[in-house]
Amino acid sequence: MPDSSFDGKAFVLTLPSQPGVYRMLNAAGDVIYVGKAIDLRKRVSSYFQKSNLSPRIQLMVSQITGIETTVTRSEAEALLLENNLIKSLAPRYNILFRDDKSYPYLLLTNHAFPRLAFYRGALDNRHQYFGPFPNAGVVKSSIQLLQKVFRLRTCENSVFNNRTRPCLLHQIKRCSAPCVNLITPEAYREDVNSAALFLQGKQDEVLKTIEQKMFEASDRQAYEQAVLFRDQMQALRMIQEKQFVDSSRALDADVIACTTGTDKHTVAVNLVMIRSGRHLGDKTFFPQNTHEDSISTVLEAFVSQHYLNRSVPPLIILGKKIRVTLLQKLLSEQAGHKVTLTINPIGERRKWLDMATENAQLALRQKQIQQASQEDRLQALQEVLNLPGLARIECFDISHTMGEATMASCVVYDHYAMRNGEYRRYNITGITPGDDYAAMRDVLQRRYAKIAMEEGKLPDLILIDGGKGQIGVASEVMIELGLNDIPLVGVAKGEARKPGLEQLILPWQEETLHLPNDHPALHLIQQIRDEAHRFAIQGHRAKRAKTRKTSSLEQIAGIGSKRRQNLLTRFGGLKGVKNASIEELQQTEGVSRALAEKIYRELR
């Protein structure tokens, strides 16, 4: 438990000279820093003996009221634990990289006619995976490309198994329609193999195979088929010309470059992914809490945190020197294969690093321009509302369809950016359908009851997507919770309901406020309000679709989750079940004649 009379020098004497992890706590009991050490006593004592600590570290030490330690068997184990704790606790004085969702893959399923699909999650060795890719857009564009060249199916198995005629994708020459046997299993398998070779970087091999097929088709006077093969070759050659490829060998590598802004506080880390010699794309990260840290320190933190519980390529190329030996050992153990970290490469790999550095510099310039714009907008809003020091804004919206599947959203804007990780959705039940006031009351009570008990951050401003009625309800809730000192602003759409005509409802004055269409404060309000609306309607649509898809079947006596799934799988969805005859329903596993008749009757 943190102690305001904590004596750091005395505490150090109780520590062992062994590897481990230490956690520094403040008066509130929050972990403000996590570190690792080969020698716990020596490392922790350095914070209380050095006189040349940076101002930032001096401030951190002044806030320490307790330290917790964990002894580990090795420095590598300490490094692993340190990064697990940094990811889970996000201490304010550690360099933090946003923990994105797992990287997406391109999937070829284990099926007689394999399906080409976007995939994110745990890997199953029954299927073929290609990647990882830096973002979803790269995977989706790759799927479109492979559809165009190899015409592989992308439909779900439930749809594939129940088609009776080719779909639109076949008509536009994006699928060979294996669902209705317009291609033989052998020919489809050849297309799948060619697609797999292409994704493995063996484009020349694929081109030779297609060229041979083209000549064979021409010799048989199957000119229409020969033209198809010719078009495939042309498409593949165009792709080759656009791709950045390592001509020496088809290796897998990640290239990581880091750059700082002119203020030395803003840092960008660019990750370029090379798989099978192909440049799959890049992704830029902007770490938090990097004040006074060197580029080498930032890079080491990135490598440590980024590859935790992720796939690791055999080669990682870096532009600055870091402690390679420990990281290589840890990453190799985690990956199950040798991982090499290369510093300052030459030749072709130097070009890759230069490209990553240029990407990082460009992304940093763009972010600084964007942040300057956000600073101007926030400053304008502070002046309009007379709220100096305004930093954190929370916005609420309610979404439903005629009272069905009501969903509320709360989005967070803090220090010039939307904070996606702090967004929350609230499932609204137990109210009169369509009662927006009751829905707003419910979400605000649930959101701020915990914060009133000091279990979260208080916003500097609350935006409500609505007019005087919603603001009135919001004011009542905040008074009940003792939080009525937090300013509330309602964002009403106005009579024409057009962007730019919004009226701001301010509880502390009678007249509504109307800002000019080009006012930067209005632009910030619109940005936050639109994000709350998007997040709410996205959740509402998902809830509504789930309800509509399952409720009709689940309300029938005798239909549990297993029988419902059997029916939906067999008929490709609820619509197929509704259109099925009693005899067809009876053929479903677990469905008797009597139950089939009941389903037929209930769904009509």
UniProtKB/Swiss-Prot annotation:
Interacts with UvrB in an incision complex. The gene is uvrC. This is UvrABC system protein C. Residues 17-95 form the GIY-YIG domain. Belongs to the UvrC family. PANTHER family: UVRABC SYSTEM PROTEIN C, UVRC/OXIDOREDUCTASE. Gene3D superfamilies: 5' to 3' exonuclease, C-terminal subdomain, GIY-YIG endonuclease, UvrC, RNAse H endonuclease domain. InterPro entries: GIY-YIG_endonuc, GIY-YIG_endonuc_sf, GIY-YIG_UvrC_Cho, Hlx-hairpin-Hlx_DNA-bd_motif, RuvA_2-like, UVR_dom, UVR_dom_sf, UvrABC_protein_C.
